[in-house]
Amino acid sequence: MAQQKEHQQESEFLERLVAVNRVTKVVKGGRQFAFAALVVIGDGKGKVGYGYGKAKEVPVAIQKAMDQAKKNLVTIALNKDTLQHAITGHHGAARVFMQPASEGTGIIAGGAMRAVFDVVGVKDVLAKCQGTRNPGNVIRATINALTSMATPEKVAAKRGKSVEEILSHVQ
C-alpha cells in the first residue's frame, strides 16, 4: 500500500536523466569509482527542479538526484506554451539565450536545455547555448534565466501602469 502511494506521488513529475558520469576518488590504496547523475524534473505546468547525486551504483545515484531535484523545485511563469519574453541567463561560463516562439515551432534547443523545457511545459521556444556546454552549468543557467522572467503583471506593478499599457508596447 505504501509503495503504491509512493509510486503515485512520483508519477506526478516528468523526469529526464541528463547525464551520468563515472567519477574517481584517488586514495592511498588506489582508485575508488563512483557514479554521478544529473536529473531534471518538472510537472509540465511551470514547475522545474534539478538534482545531482553520487553513489557507488547508478540507480542509487539517480535516486539521490531525484530526491534533491524534488527539494529544489521552482515555479516558472509561462505564457501558454512559451516564454513571456526573450531572456538570457548565465552560470559559470555557460550563457543561454531564449526567446518565445510562435505556436507550432517546437523546442529549438539542444542538450541539457531541451530536457529543462520538456519537463517545465514549454512547447515552443528558440534557444541557444554559448560558452561551456557542461550540462550542470547549462541547466543552472537555464533555470536562473527562467526564474528571472517577469510577467506583464509584475512589470505593470513595478512601473505603476496597467497591464494593458504594458502589453500594448509589446505588440
Curated annotation (Swiss-Prot):
InterPro entries registered for this protein in UniProt: Ribosomal_Su5_D2-typ_SF, Ribosomal_uS5, Ribosomal_uS5_bac-type, Ribosomal_uS5_C, Ribosomal_uS5_N, Ribosomal_uS5_N_CS, Ribsml_uS5_D2-typ_fold_subgr
GO cellular component: small ribosomal subunit
GO molecular function, one term: rRNA binding
Assembly and interaction partners: Part of the 30S ribosomal subunit. Contacts proteins S4 and S8.
Keyword rRNA-binding included in the entry's annotation: yes
Family the entry assigns: Belongs to the universal ribosomal protein uS5 family.
Domain remark in the UniProt entry: The N-terminal domain interacts with the head of the 30S subunit; the C-terminal domain interacts with the body and contacts protein S4. The interaction surface between S4 and S5 is involved in control of translational fidelity.
Protein name: Small ribosomal subunit protein uS5
Sequence ranges assigned to domain S5 DRBM in this UniProt record: 13-76
Annotated keywords: Ribonucleoprotein, Ribosomal protein, RNA-binding, rRNA-binding
Primary role: With S4 and S12 plays an important role in translational accuracy. Located at the back of the 30S subunit body where it stabilizes the conformation of the head with respect to the body.
GO biological process assignments: translation
Organism, scientific name: Dichelobacter nodosus (strain VCS1703A)
